[in-house]
């Protein structure tokens, strides 16, 4: 068997026909500058080929469902294993996904509660026993005399299929009728069911009229029905068609409540049998929110205070205006009064309606005037009703802007039905258990006392649950709860959850490819992660990690440094081998930082700010313990703390959302806090995250930064364009006129291959240039518009050196380390770190007011040490201009250059949410209680 994975002639993206041998069954780190080609080698070449070879082995029918698998641009790869990629882009946005379902722990929990749970009555809470035939008969005998009823045996409950055997068995048993999905059918006729739908089938065992001497016949019929269905009997009263379920399995004698047989699906919130009937298992409902309908109560109705769709148009002849004028007349207010000055009675009528009370509405139409008498529904009620009724996706989106998620009133966020929540193991229902943190859940399971047969049944289930919880703890996620929605996890958290799931599967001989697993991890938890990666390797797997973290590099068996620069300056193997080999290579930028030849210097002094502060009072979102936090304005401030300590809750949920609403007029609902002081010292908030700058191939750095408008104006001002009468619109690839119509300005044409992957080929008409021939004939300094879009930022800087307006925007792209990115490069091909730096460059190119606060969440994600160096210089420039920069960060190189640090903790989850220490890096390093301080001490 080969002991290397041998890649020959890789040319994906910017790779320059490289060849490399990676040792198998080892921990291999790929490093290099951002954009140097690491991901192209790891994901677009090695992983893509491993995946493609696996899919090739499947039938063409199976391949049809698996989407496209292009052959990567590489000559050959030998020694490849089946590849599993664990990246950060695949966080589930499905509201039904939770940490428990993603890790599959919840499947084992459902099994445990179904097999070992103690059912209770959902009404009175008493433990429930099974009912005997005599008890069922006694209950039925209490019906009033002459009541007509029938007994049914439920033989199929919510199962797909045609169920012909069920009908044949019933005919052979001498039965005449069945009830299917609520309708009665005669068994003498042929019954055809849709095999793709779920059906309920009940055999009608007997039809009876209640009289005193019925007990004997009733007992026989109940027994027959119970035997047919495995213990269930349905009593159907013919006078009101109501059903009562009896179970030989579980029932409460006091309340008459019967429970079905416990089964795993009863505990699934994705199954109608277990889900809460009101919210269908989501745990939340969208409710019209007055604070989003009226985001700014200092405005009057005529100034547009009411922002709900349908009520935001208050022109003279609008229906909304007529209603508001009638309300103003009735409740004696003016439409020019600020909304906050209206009486409670008037506000209630505007928001919740006038009930049955009529308003007198005067209207004018082309055919004359008129008067209407009718009640007003209220804005909140109107939004809620239209949201429930509309079938239009666009309308849903528009109305959603005025709605907020609230816990479901029936299950209070627990997602399951009353019956499912009434079953306990160790005194807890399944959702109470899921709300425990991973570490608490593990200790609950380790101390769970079960007796007799139940202990034997539970043994294997408990072993699986405990091992999976231990793996989650091992990758630094002890603070998460199993009920946490997967969509709320950060990229790093979701990646580590999938890592824990993979360890749980205990595969060997697999190639695992990971993309920066240390993201979002505090230095303290990094050692646990490295132990996990070593464990995965020791099982007999090859672990290939794309990483910039120094600790991971020092722990690796083999390092490959891709570079030497980024983009066109990268794509080569600079060095490969042990840590010492990388340090010894003079061309390796990574080696220079590892050896200490290059390093990020400490600043000469710390800024104290401009004397003003932004103060958050009473922050209590998620695990925050009612904090009062001060941020000095005019400084570079870092918020630090272990994973789950409350950094994102404080900065993103409370501060950013409040500032965005107050300064940028955004309609968002901030987290829980009392008040924020010091807003008057700011005029703008800018949140710079790693989300894509555009989701279509048409979006690119030139369009995002606003540079493309200037370039189009420049081409439109050339003598050639003026002679032809071309305006700036002629040079847009999004509108008809100048673009190539064969590919609609995309430059690529999609060819559907049905059984094979769709193929994208350059457009034959324009050759991938996006524009038609006439547009491309207009030149500036010998280049056409397509040539300019194909330039890297570095090339463009020299090309436009005499045009300060354009040059300054391009210079900021180069300053943030994106000199290698092409101006027209599709935004879908940019990494998260690159997208973030495009946003930073856009902000840098704007005129600074000195009163802006910039909020960044882990800006060093995806950045090499050399890029972090550049990023810090850019952030310091923003602060030097008088602005405030607030960063959530784990990277010690960024933390050590900050002016002020707010360290949260001390732990994650419930044990976090407090301020451990605030002050300069030196003050934080002196604090014994701060984990951040202990690691920072070594760098100062």
Question: What is each PLM-predicted segment?
Answer:
Residues 1-940:
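Conserved phosphate-binding elements of NTP-dependent enzyme cores
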């Amino acid at each position: 068997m080969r002991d290397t994975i041998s890649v020959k002639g890789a040319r994906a993206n910017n790779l320059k026909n490289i060849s490399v041998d990676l040792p198998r069954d080892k921990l291999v780190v790929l490093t290099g500058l951002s954009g140097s080609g690491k991901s192209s080698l790891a994901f677009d070449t090695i992983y893509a080929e491993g995946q493609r070879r696996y899919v090739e082995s499947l039938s063409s029918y199976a391949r049809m469902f698996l989407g496209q698998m292009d052959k990567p641009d590489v000559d050959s790869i030998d020694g490849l294993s089946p590849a599993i990629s664990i990246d950060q882009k695949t966080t589930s946005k499905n509201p039904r996904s939770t940490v428990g379902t993603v890790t599959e722990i919840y499947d084992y929990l459902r099994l445990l509660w179904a097999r070992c749970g103690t059912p209770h009555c959902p009404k009175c809470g008493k433990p429930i026993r099974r009912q005997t035939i005599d008890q069922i008969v006694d209950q039925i005998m209490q019906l009033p005399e002459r009541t007509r009823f029938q007994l049914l045996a439920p033989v199929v409950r919510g199962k797909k299929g045609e169920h012909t055997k069920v009908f044949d068995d019933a005919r052979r048993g001498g039965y005449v009728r069945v009830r299917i999905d609520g309708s009665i059918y005669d068994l003498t006729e042929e019954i055809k069911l849709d095999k793709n739908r779920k059906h309920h089938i009940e055999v009608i065992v007997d039809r009876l009229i209640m009289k005193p001497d019925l007990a004997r016949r009733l007992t026989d019929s109940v027994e027959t029905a119970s035997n047919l269905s495995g213990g269930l009997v349905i009593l159907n009263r013919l006078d009101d068609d109501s059903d009562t379920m009896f179970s030989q399995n579980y029932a409460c004698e006091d309340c008459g409540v019967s429970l079905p047989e416990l089964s795993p699906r009863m505990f699934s919130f994705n199954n109608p049998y277990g889900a809460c009937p009101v919210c269908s298992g989501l745990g939340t409902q969208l409710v019209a929110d007055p604070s989003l309908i009226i985001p700014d109560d200092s405005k009057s109705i005529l100034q547009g205070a009411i922002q709900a769709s349908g009520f935001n148009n208050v022109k003279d002849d609008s229906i909304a205006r007529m209603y508001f004028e009638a309300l103003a007349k009735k409740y004696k207010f003016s439409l020019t009064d600020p909304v906050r000055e209206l009486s409670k009675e008037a506000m209630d009528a505007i928001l919740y309606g006038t009930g049955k009370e009529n308003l007198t509405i005067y209207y004018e139409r082309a055919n004359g005037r008129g008067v209407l008498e009718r009640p007003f529904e209220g804005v909140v009620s109107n939004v809620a009703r239209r949201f429930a009724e509309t079938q239009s996706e666009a309308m849903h989106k528009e109305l959603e802007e005025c709605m907020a998620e609230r816990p479901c009133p029936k299950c209070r966020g627990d997602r399951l039905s009353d019956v499912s929540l009434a079953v306990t193991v160790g005194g807890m229902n399944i959702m109470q258990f899921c709300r425990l943190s991973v570490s608490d859940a593990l200790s609950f399971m380790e101390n769970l006392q079960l007796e007799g047969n139940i202990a034997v049944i539970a043994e294997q289930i408990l072993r699986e649950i405990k091992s999976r919880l231990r793996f989650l703890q091992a990758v630094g996620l002890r603070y998460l709860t199993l009920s946490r929605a997967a969509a709320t996890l950060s990229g790093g958290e979701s990646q580590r959850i999938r890592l824990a799931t993979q360890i749980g599967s205990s595969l060997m001989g697999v190639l695992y490819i990971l993309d920066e697993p240390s993201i979002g991890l505090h230095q303290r938890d990094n050692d646990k992660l490295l132990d996990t990666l070593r464990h995965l390797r020791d099982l007999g797997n090859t672990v290939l990690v794309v990483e910039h973290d120094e600790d991971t590099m020092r722990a690796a068996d083999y390092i490959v440094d891709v570079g030497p620069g980024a983009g066109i300056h990268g794509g080569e193997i600079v060095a490969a081998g042990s840590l010492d080999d990388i340090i010894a290579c003079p061309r390796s930028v990574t080696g220079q930082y590892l050896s200490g030849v290059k390093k990020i210097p400490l600043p000469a002094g710390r800024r104290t700010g401009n004397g003003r502060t932004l103060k958050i009072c009473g922050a209590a979102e998620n695990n925050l313990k009612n904090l009062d936090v001060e941020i000095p304005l005019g400084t570079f401030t870092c918020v630090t703390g272990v994973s789950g300590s409350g950094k994102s809750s404080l900065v993103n949920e409370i501060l950013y959302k409040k500032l965005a609403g107050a300064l940028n007029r955004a309609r968002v609902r901030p987290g829980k806090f009392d008040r924020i002081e010091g807003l008057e010292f700011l005029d703008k908030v800018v949140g710079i995250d790693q989300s894509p700058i555009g989701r279509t191939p048409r979006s690119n750095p030139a369009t995002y930064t606003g540079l493309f408008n200037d370039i189009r104006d420049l081409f439109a001002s050339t003598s050639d364009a003026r002679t032809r009468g071309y305006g700036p619109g002629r040079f847009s690839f999004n509108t008809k006129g100048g673009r190539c119509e064969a590919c609609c300005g995309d430059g690529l044409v999609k060819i559907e291959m049905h059984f094979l992957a769709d193929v994208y080929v350059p457009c034959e008409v324009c050759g991938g240039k996006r524009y038609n021939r006439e547009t491309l004939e207009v030149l500036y300094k010998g280049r056409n518009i397509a040539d300019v879009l194909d330039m890297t930022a570095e090339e463009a800087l020299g090309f436009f050196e005499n045009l300060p307006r354009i040059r300054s925007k391009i210079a900021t792209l180069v300053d943030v380390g994106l000199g290698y990115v092409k101006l027209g490069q599709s935004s879908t091909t940019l990494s998260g770190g690159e997208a973030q730096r495009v946003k930073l460059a856009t902000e840098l190119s704007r005129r600074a007011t000195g009163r802006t606060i910039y909020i960044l969440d882990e800006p060093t994600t995806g950045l090499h040490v050399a890029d972090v160096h550049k990023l810090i210089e850019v952030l310091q420039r923003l602060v030097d201009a008088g602005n405030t920069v607030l960063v959530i960060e784990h990277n010690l190189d960024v933390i050590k250059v900050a002016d002020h640090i707010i360290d949260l903790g001390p732990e994650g989850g419930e044990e976090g949410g407090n301020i451990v220490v605030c002050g300069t890096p030196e003050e934080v390093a002196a604090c014994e209680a701060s984990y951040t301080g202990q690691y920072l001490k070594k760098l100062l």
